[in-house]
Amino acid sequence: MSIIFVHGSGGYGDIWRYQTEYFSDSHAVDLPGHPHGQLLSSVEECVDWLREYITARECSDLVLAGHSFGGAIVLLYALKYSQDLKGIIIIGSGARLRVHPMFLAPCEEAIKGNSYQWYQLVEEMYRSTPEDYKKEMIEKQKAIGPAAMLTDFLCCDSFDIMDRVHEIKMPALIITGESDAMTPAKYANYLGTKIAHSKLMIVPQAGHFVFAEKPEVVNKAIKDFVKGISS
C-alpha cells in the first residue's frame, strides 16, 4: 500500500517529513505554484492535476492523505475518482472550509509589500511544532510567499461538499487536533458522522499541525489504518 500526502494552504510537500521518513512507500507532492509552476485557482483544478500526477506514475493500492486545503483536495478526489483509491486520510480539514478575513488580510497586505502581519501569521501557524522543524518550515513558507497562501485560502473558502460527503464509501481515517482553531473538531465530527466507513481520532494537546506536533500518535494511527485496509 502506498501513500501520497497533500499539503495545506501555502505549504509544500516537506511539511510531511515525519510521515514520509516513517512510511517507506510514501511521498508528498508539491502542488503547482508551491513554489514551482502556475498556481491553481480551485480545489477542482487541484484534483484534476493530482489525477494526472497519479496516472502518470501508475500508482496502485493507493491511499491519499491531505491536511487542511489538502484534505479538501483528497475529499473531492474520493468523490470524483474513487476507483483510484483504497482509502483516504483527512487531517485538520472539513467538508466546508470557510476562511476568516483575519487570515486573508495579512496575505493581501503582504502582496502589497507590507509583510509584518503575514510573517506573524506564518509563525503562529507553526507555533506548537518542534523547534528545528518550525524554523525550517517557516523559512520555506515565507519563500513560497503570500500569493500562494491567499490563492489556497480562497480555494478553501469556496469549497463546500457538505451535501455530498456522505457519498464517500471507501475507508477513511479522520484526524484532528483537539486545540485546532483553524479547522475545529466539529469539522472532523461532521466527516465522521457522514462518511460511513470512517474512523475519527481527536488528538489531545494538539493544534492544526497535529501530524508534526504529535507525529508518533498520528503515524501509529495511519499505520493501523493502512494495515486494516490491506488485510
Language-model segments: what does each one mean?
Residues 98-102, 115-166:
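Conserved alpha/beta-hydrolase catalytic His-Asp/Glu region
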Residues 66-70, 74:
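Gly/Ala-rich beta-loop-alpha elbow adjacent to hydrolase catalytic centers
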